[in-house]
Amino acid sequence: MDEPALDLTGVTLSPQKEMVRVFYKLLWDHADKSLIPTIFHPDFSFRGSLGPTLVGYRQFGGYVDWVTGTFGQYTTDILAMIEEGNCVSGKMLFHGFHREELFGVLPSGRHVWWTGMPIFTFEGPKVRDLFVLGDIHGLIGRMRDA
């Protein structure tokens, strides 16, 4: 966890990068599911950093509840963002306090983290597909060591 988060204070982002910022810093950091229709098409596809593949608002909202329930004070640090055409990718640091069993590891109450590499594919101003590759093995190791 030594890499600093991007300081986006006062930075004007492209509309797509701004949507990614809103996704992580407003939707995820505050578990604000009311933002889901603002960010995504109704039948968007999502593959989360912890493994599940989901479609649509309802399934994704359940994933938000599950992750933020499993990790107290869940937060994402945006470490990098790269934009090419209708795609935004990046490097993220996901972290929180381990408070529910996950991958067979009992809750420790300790602060744990894992990195993720998202690829957001936009169709117009909204996200059509989001694929996030997560370092699950690193997370499991940190949960076990906690």
Q: Model-predicted segments: where are they?
A:
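C-terminal and inter-domain tail/linker signature
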Residues: 1-146
